[in-house]
Amino acid sequence: MSKTGVGCDLLLLAAFHPELAPLKAVLGEGMRARLGGRDVAARVVGIGLPMAAAGTAMQLVEMQPSAVVLLGTCGAYAGSGIAVGDVIAARRVRLVDYSVAQGVAQFPDPMSVVTDAHHASLQALVRAGARAADVATTLAVTVDDAAAALIARATSSHVEHLEAYGVAAACAARGIPFGAALGVANHVGARAREEWRAHHRTAAAAAVDAVLRCVDDLSSPLSRFPR
């Protein structure tokens, strides 16, 4: 813990409160407690890539964590072999734009568009039952089957999540180990919103369960927030 009493071992982040709700039973109303000998806190960063990036940057300064794990739900691309109800552990997070996938737009060459998850965090989540997967972060939910197929093919991504790249980039800028555990709530495409509404709560709870099974392995005392 930091000299100011702020720093935590593990910071769990999510786009909005329902994705953290299953943690109240173990972290309490203040969303902070000691679990397995670790100081664990949970905070909301906002919905969508811009809000999540800004919200994460603010929480890193305020909470000074040793490690971060993003929680939430995602959609699986057709052909990924990943099913609704699975939990994935992010291996790589990629910023994706449909126009780029179509070949009618380009990201500037110096622009960072890919961030790898922290290897130890990935392995801990896999041991806890999550499946390693590559995550595409789009600006909006993909609700067209052909568009979803093109994005998956062009980026070799397995799942789609709106906030992952924003959180990962903010962590990378601060040198904070990043991981993500996401419950699969839907297939990406025309039925995405309908399926998500039906499954998002159970999918979010499954992601939380995976993290709680490996809390000690997700927070490293050797990787403190730079001061």
Tell me the role of every PLM-derived stretch.
Residues 32-226:
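Glycine-rich phosphate- or other oxyanion-binding loops that anchor nucleotides, phosphorylated ligands
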Residues 1-3, 56:
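Glycine-aromatic micro-motifs
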Residues 9-29:
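N-terminal beta1-alpha1 ligand-phosphate binding loop
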Residues 5-11, 40:
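Extreme N-terminal starter segment of soluble prokaryotic enzymes
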Residues 3-5, 35:
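Generic structural signal for beta-strand residues in well-ordered domains
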